[in-house]
Amino acid sequence: MLKPVRIALDAMGGDVGPQAIIPGAARALQRLGDVRFRFYGDRAQVEPLLRQHPALADVSSVHHTDVTVRMDDKPSQALRAGRRVSSMWQAIEAVKTGEADVVLSAGNTGALMAMAKVCLRMLPGIDRPAIAGIWPTLRGRSIVLDIGATIGADAPHLVDLAIMGAAMARIVLKVERPRIGLLNVGVEEIKGLEEVKTASRLLRQLTLPSLVYHGFVEGDDIGRGTVDVVVTEGFTGNIALKTAEGTAKQIAQYIREEMGRSFWSKIGYLLARRAFDALKQKLDPRQINGGVFLGLDGIVIKSHGGSDTIGTANAIEISYAMARYEILSKIRESLDLTREARAALLVEGTGSLERMAAPHRARQDELGENKVVGADQSMTAKATGT
């Protein structure tokens, strides 16, 4: 019999904190069953809500904290004020100590990444983290990474993203050998930044039993579902994500305006209501809520800061899947199989994407936005969901 998945929840994270986290967990429990929850936050706020859901209370424990990381805190501020004492830190630490299998927070993304890097550290051989998101497509769903953890990437890092993204796709998409595409300005091999072209050559050279390299893909291929995993660096990935979210809202607004324009349009809406409801479901970002932090030596999931009960429940289901199907073991296995080949790739050096990102990171370090207290590491604070 499988052991229940233990999920540590930052109960104070997000725009409404426990008002969304607790009922979201109750909703997820109805679907999952074999799960246990550890809530970290203000006991006075968490326990009254928990009592409204007896089934959830039976499989949960509450761990009081006095400090909450604010949504507008800089990562350096969050670490100074919240290290070891905040709900976010203690939820992450539960994974490190083995008390939980996965941590979920709807809090400040930059702070969550900074704390996770300090507390959990990176996987051996991985220098920089990534955020992977689930993307609705015409063929179902795909994985896109990086969607905002790190700005700029060299070719070996893009290869690492492909390996980690493939591991996630095997769990989420149930595909044994996911098709991988590198996001580029064209599909021709001569197009794009040198670093992306180098990464493409490296992926073709590697013999990876865990994935199939498709080649370059363009922006419109993401929604088409041309590949299972789209790999890019965090700057372009985050722009693609925000553009898609904005386009979905724009389409929904157009439909609402047209449906209310005349009597006949209202009649048309009523006749096609089932189809419109299905479209609304596909465009609803709550259905794919939950960004996975890859590259860390522990499983960390980021829920959108504005998530409601439905969005939270879906993020918990992603958390459950990543832990139940052992995403870390799959990533470690893939990295071990390619360790020597990936080490040889380092001689390729860095290229234009890395040079493009260097001034940005230097400026952020100067402002103190990316300095990690107590460790000689830095990170990119800007990411999704903050």
Swiss-Prot record:
Q: HAMAP family annotated for this entry?
A: PlsX (MF_00019)
- Looking at the keywords, is Transferase present? yes
| Biased amino acid composition, Polar residues | 377-386
Catalysed conversion reaction:
a fatty acyl-[ACP] + phosphate = an acyl phosphate + holo-[ACP]
Q: What is its EC number?
A: 2.3.1.274
Subcellular location(s): the record lists:
Cytoplasm
Q: GO molecular-function annotation terms?
A: phosphate:acyl-[acyl carrier protein] acyltransferase activity
Listed as disulfide-bonded, the cysteine pairs are: none
Q: In which pathway does it act?
A: Lipid metabolism; phospholipid metabolism
Name of the molecule in the record:
Phosphate acyltransferase
Q: EC class of this enzyme? A: transferase
